[in-house]
């Protein structure tokens, strides 16, 4: 009886496959004249073996000969594949992560590959040449918590299959050719990292649905084609953010005072957009910020003295170049002398490297649509610096543009 049991266990972990010297690939799988018996450590590995071999046959470029290691039954020794015990089963062995970062492999699609690893926790394939769309069946990968497909050739809409995957904490789809809008739910998901920069996303950013809470630490939307205003709910609810990169899009309107709620941020970059109006005084609530970039917008008014005064100890860079600011007070001049503040190419009288008088005049005579509605909101702040009243702070930030 014991011998029969051992034989049965052996057969569960084996699979009949053709000899590598004569194997052929067909739509029905692997066939060949000569067959060999491969013994696998676990049935889970036997199941993914043909998946790997099928994907291997689709690879058209392998400059580092990675796939030459994808032979035999020892899948755990294949380069790029890593095995571990699946959750809730410490005696089993499975492919827990796939890491092809920097392999420069080329394949037309990952359809039928990533979605076949039932126990996959990490999928990292940045800096390859994979194309197509992200398979919708990845929604079935219940253990997946890191997805990095950056720097490839993926196309189509935002991979909506990731929406609702409660285990996902890290999504990186940078440097691809995704387009369209992003689903509102993704901003309210339990993510720590969301990198979607350097794609072709358009439309305006959605407001965060539900209770408007989020746990995102790093949010990068840079180098897309997002337009419309900065959603107040995103700024208001993302106190956990440490890096906010919205640069080089087409955002319009004024900077909401809710930006002052990004109290955990060390880097905020909204340069290279079409934002207008004055800088909100709530910026002085950003106690941890080290780098602030608003360069290349349509901002005007005075550089707020309160911001320069209260953030001077932590600020490493405050870039306001290529705007239409008209005044810099003594505290801000101190940051200029330290090389922290950059106000080049503005409209500040008697300052070097400013716009021409004609260029400034043309900007300030434009219709009042360039002024923000509810201007008093820009003097609103909610932080521990409440001893500075809105009335006294108005001395820091004159709202009226000078005569051209």
UniProtKB/Swiss-Prot annotation:
Q: Where is the signal peptide?
A: 1-16
Entry's localization field: Secreted
Is Secreted there in the keyword field?
Answer: yes
Q: Which Pfam families match?
A: LRR_1
Question: LRR repeat positions in this chain?
Answer: 117-141, 142-165, 167-188, 189-212, 214-237, 239-262, 263-286, 287-310, 312-338, 340-359
Main location as per UniProt: secreted
InterPro entries noted in UniProt: Leu-rich_rpt, LRR_dom_sf, LRR_extensin-like_regulator
| Keywords, alphabetical | Leucine-rich repeat, Repeat, Secreted, Signal
Keyword NADP set for record = no
Q: Give a Gene Ontology cellular component term annotated to this protein.
A: extracellular region
Instruction: Write the protein's name.
Output: Uncharacterized protein At4g06744
Annotated source species: Arabidopsis thaliana
Q: What is the lineage of its organism?
A: Eukaryota, Viridiplantae, Streptophyta, Embryophyta, Tracheophyta
